[in-house]
């Protein structure tokens, strides 16, 4: 391996030769983060964090600021693309057993939580009708905390209802959290490269490594180009594809939308929340829908790291993916039969994956031992 220069040697970082396209989503997420930070900065220049002016300032960006419509739409579509990439990234980690690198997996779970918080605060900023009511519903969940709930909610709101102080602090949080995400992403990448990437076979790649550049860097470039191209196509022809029609109306505390729902990327967690008729139980289920990912490294029982050669576990994995989509779909529907039953059933299946998976690992171990 040539070692003429530090920069050259970092480009020639040895990487397993068989990592597939599913490993490109990390670099795509970094691209999304850079895009969101840059477009967000230019939006913050023109945005006004005031309940009387916020909605008008967004319209001003779209209509009056040169290329403002490009910046605003890229930021909105970029958020959806960010979540598409991160959910695919997590699914790949679950499928190929990447979670066994505990530090990387746990730092990644923290990144997901911070990203969800950041995007929630950002969704409130335009001060549209759905922004206001989604903020009201989600922040109200804090009141489910025994003893401290009401105090925490009042502190977060900056008063006894969602008002100007709430919008101001949400803007401040939405501005500062991306820098924390950048810091944690750096830690995530450093931790990853201290041990090295996993691969589709889940084997030790030390026996067969190739330089990162040009082999994998070109693969990354291709996927990043495809992602940016798809974003530009959506921005040009379907800019409101991921937007809620209710959010084109200014926030009105006196008129409740017929169906309050967050952005699509929160719908799976929101669907789990709605499926439990108890406020505290629903809030705990909402938190557990994310935090249960942290259990994966500690409940792995199979002798094989990846699911590539584990057909029973593959069935469970694809059941999880279908369940995720089902919960997302059912959360867009009203809280009435049969959607309540569908959400509840799908939620049980979602959590059961993390219980059945270790049991299947034991079963597969027994089968392998018997065959040997």
From Swiss-Prot:
Compartments in which it is found: Mitochondrion inner membrane
Family annotation (InterPro entries): Cyt_b/b6_C (IPR005798), Cyt_b/b6_C_sf (IPR036150), Cyt_b/b6_N (IPR005797), Cytb/b6-like_sf (IPR027387), Cytochrome_b (IPR030689), Cytochrome_b_C_euk/bac (IPR048260), Cytochrome_b_N_euk/bac (IPR048259), Di-haem_cyt_TM (IPR016174)
An MF annotation (GO) of this entry: ubiquinol-cytochrome-c reductase activity
Residues bound to a ubiquinone: 193
Binding site for heme b b566: 89, 188
Gene Ontology, cellular component aspect: mitochondrial inner membrane; respiratory chain complex III
Topology term for the membrane: Multi-pass membrane protein
GO biological process: mitochondrial electron transport, ubiquinol to cytochrome c
Keywords: Electron transport, Heme, Iron, Membrane, Metal-binding, Mitochondrion, Mitochondrion inner membrane, Respiratory chain, Transmembrane, Transmembrane helix, Transport, Ubiquinone
Binding residues for heme b b562: 75, 174
Main localization category: mitochondrion
TM annotation in the entry: 25-45, 69-90, 105-125, 170-190, 218-238, 280-300, 312-332, 339-358
Record keyword Transmembrane helix present: yes
SUPFAM superfamilies in the cross-refs: a domain/subunit of cytochrome bc1 complex (Ubiquinol-cytochrome c reductase), Transmembrane di-heme cytochromes
Cofactor (UniProt): heme b
CC cofactor note: Binds 2 heme b groups non-covalently.
Keyword Electron transport belongs to the record: yes
Note: Heme 1 (or BL or b562) is low-potential and absorbs at about 562 nm, and heme 2 (or BH or b566) is high-potential and absorbs at about 566 nm.
Subunit: The cytochrome bc1 complex contains 3 respiratory subunits (MT-CYB, CYC1 and UQCRFS1), 2 core proteins (UQCRC1 and UQCRC2) and probably 6 low-molecular weight proteins.
Record family assignment: Belongs to the cytochrome b family.
Function: Component of the ubiquinol-cytochrome c reductase complex (complex III or cytochrome b-c1 complex) that is part of the mitochondrial respiratory chain. The b-c1 complex mediates electron transfer from ubiquinol to cytochrome c. Contributes to the generation of a proton gradient across the mitochondrial membrane that is then used for ATP synthesis.
Protein name (database record): Cytochrome b
Species this chain originates from: Hydrophis semperi
GN (gene name): MT-CYB
